[in-house]
C-alpha cells in the first residue's frame, strides 16, 4: 500500500485531494472552491504580517496603517494585497454561490453543505466589516457608527447593545480595539468552518452540471482536476496582481484616506462594494427595525432554497424557465449593488424597493412556482413520448 494511504495523516490528504473521485463532467465553475481556499490563505497570511505592525489604539490606528504603507519593507504590497484580496474573495464567493444556485448544489443530499456555506458567507461579511473599521479612516469611522447603530432598532435593549458594542457612548478606542481582536480571530473560525464544509462535501461528493448522479463516471482528482485548478489559480493571481500593482485603490473608497473625524460627516456613507446590495435592501425599507430585519433576512433566505425548490431535476441546465429567471435574479442583484452606491433620492428609493421585492420573490415565489410548472411540463413530455 502506498505510504500516502497507510499514514494516518497523509491518508486524509489523499482522500480529499489526490484519490478523491470527482464526476468527469464538472466544468470550470467547480474551480471556485479552490480559489476561495487560496483567497483565505492570502488573507490570513497577509493579515498576520500586517498585525505585526498595526496598532489598534484609536490615536495610532490610521497612522500605523500609513506606517505599514511607507516604512515597512514591501508593506504597501501587504496592505494592497490584503485589501484587494478581500474584494476578490467576495467576487469568487459570489460566483461560487451563483454556481450553487444555478446547478442546484443546495438540493438534497447536500443541504448541510449548503447551510455551512451560508454560515461561512455570514462570517466573511462580519470579518470584512470589522477589518474595514480597523483602518479608522473617515469612511471606517462612520461605517462603524452606522452599522452598529442598527442594533438600536431592537426594542427595549437596542441602545444598551450599541453601548456594549462600542464600549462607551460612541465609536472610540475600545471599539477599534475589540473590532481588531475579533477581526484577527474570526478568519480562523472561518478556516474551521471551511474544514466542516469539506467534510460535508466529502460525504456525498461533488455535484455535476448534468444534475444526475456522478457515481457511474468518476475520475481521481489528481492529476486531472489538480492541473485544471492550476489554470484558474494562475489566471486569478494574474488578475489580482494587475489590481495590486497597477490599480490598488479602484475597489476602495477615497474618503478612507482621510483620518476618522467624528465631527465631520461624509457626503455619502457607503460600505465596501461587496456589501452594497444588502445596504440597498436596508435603505429600501423606511422603517428602521423592518429594514434591519429585511437586510439580515436577505442573507438567511438562502437557507430556505432546499425547501422551496420542488423540481424533480437538479440544476437549471435543462430548464429554460429557471435559466431565464436565474439571470433576471443575477441582473437584479447587480442592480441592487448599483443602487446601494447612490444617494437616497428619487428614483433610487423606488428602484431599490422594487429590486428588493424581486430579490425575495425569487426565493419565496418564483423558484417554487417555476419548479412546479416545470415538473408538470416534464411529466407531460414523458407521457407524450
From Swiss-Prot:
<feature type="transmembrane region" description="Helical">
    <location>
        <begin position="32"/>
        <end position="52"/>
    </location>
</feature>
<dbReference type="Pfam" id="PF00033">
    <property type="entry name" value="Cytochrome_B"/>
</dbReference>
<comment type="function">
    <text>Component of the ubiquinol-cytochrome c reductase complex (complex III or cytochrome b-c1 complex) that is part of the mitochondrial respiratory chain. The b-c1 complex mediates electron transfer from ubiquinol to cytochrome c. Contributes to the generation of a proton gradient across the mitochondrial membrane that is then used for ATP synthesis.</text>
</comment>
<dbReference type="GO" id="GO:0005743">
    <property type="term" value="C:mitochondrial inner membrane"/>
</dbReference>
<dbReference type="InterPro" id="IPR027387">
    <property type="entry name" value="Cytb/b6-like_sf"/>
</dbReference>
<keyword id="KW-0999">Mitochondrion inner membrane</keyword>
<feature type="binding site" description="axial binding residue">
    <location>
        <position position="183"/>
    </location>
    <ligand>
        <name>heme b b562</name>
    </ligand>
</feature>
<keyword id="KW-0479">Metal-binding</keyword>
<protein>
    <recommendedName>
        <fullName>Cytochrome b</fullName>
    </recommendedName>
</protein>
<dbReference type="InterPro" id="IPR048259">
    <property type="entry name" value="Cytochrome_b_N_euk/bac"/>
</dbReference>
<dbReference type="GO" id="GO:0046872">
    <property type="term" value="F:metal ion binding"/>
</dbReference>
<dbReference type="InterPro" id="IPR048260">
    <property type="entry name" value="Cytochrome_b_C_euk/bac"/>
</dbReference>
<keyword id="KW-0408">Iron</keyword>
<keyword id="KW-0812">Transmembrane</keyword>
<keyword id="KW-0472">Membrane</keyword>
<dbReference type="InterPro" id="IPR030689">
    <property type="entry name" value="Cytochrome_b"/>
</dbReference>
<dbReference type="InterPro" id="IPR016174">
    <property type="entry name" value="Di-haem_cyt_TM"/>
</dbReference>
<dbReference type="GO" id="GO:0006122">
    <property type="term" value="P:mitochondrial electron transport, ubiquinol to cytochrome c"/>
</dbReference>
<feature type="binding site" description="axial binding residue">
    <location>
        <position position="82"/>
    </location>
    <ligand>
        <name>heme b b562</name>
    </ligand>
</feature>
<dbReference type="InterPro" id="IPR005797">
    <property type="entry name" value="Cyt_b/b6_N"/>
</dbReference>
<comment type="similarity">
    <text>Belongs to the cytochrome b family.</text>
</comment>
<dbReference type="InterPro" id="IPR036150">
    <property type="entry name" value="Cyt_b/b6_C_sf"/>
</dbReference>
<dbReference type="Pfam" id="PF00032">
    <property type="entry name" value="Cytochrom_B_C"/>
</dbReference>
<dbReference type="GO" id="GO:0045275">
    <property type="term" value="C:respiratory chain complex III"/>
</dbReference>
<feature type="transmembrane region" description="Helical">
    <location>
        <begin position="321"/>
        <end position="341"/>
    </location>
</feature>
<feature type="transmembrane region" description="Helical">
    <location>
        <begin position="348"/>
        <end position="368"/>
    </location>
</feature>
<feature type="transmembrane region" description="Helical">
    <location>
        <begin position="179"/>
        <end position="199"/>
    </location>
</feature>
<keyword id="KW-0679">Respiratory chain</keyword>
<feature type="binding site" description="axial binding residue">
    <location>
        <position position="96"/>
    </location>
    <ligand>
        <name>heme b b566</name>
    </ligand>
</feature>
<keyword id="KW-0249">Electron transport</keyword>
<comment type="subunit">
    <text>Fungal cytochrome b-c1 complex contains 10 subunits; 3 respiratory subunits, 2 core proteins and 5 low-molecular weight proteins. Cytochrome b-c1 complex is a homodimer.</text>
</comment>
<keyword id="KW-0813">Transport</keyword>
<keyword id="KW-0830">Ubiquinone</keyword>
<feature type="transmembrane region" description="Helical">
    <location>
        <begin position="76"/>
        <end position="98"/>
    </location>
</feature>
<feature type="transmembrane region" description="Helical">
    <location>
        <begin position="113"/>
        <end position="133"/>
    </location>
</feature>
<dbReference type="GO" id="GO:0008121">
    <property type="term" value="F:ubiquinol-cytochrome-c reductase activity"/>
</dbReference>
<feature type="transmembrane region" description="Helical">
    <location>
        <begin position="289"/>
        <end position="309"/>
    </location>
</feature>
<dbReference type="InterPro" id="IPR005798">
    <property type="entry name" value="Cyt_b/b6_C"/>
</dbReference>
<keyword id="KW-1133">Transmembrane helix</keyword>
<keyword id="KW-0496">Mitochondrion</keyword>
<feature type="binding site">
    <location>
        <position position="202"/>
    </location>
    <ligand>
        <name>a ubiquinone</name>
    </ligand>
</feature>
<keyword id="KW-0349">Heme</keyword>
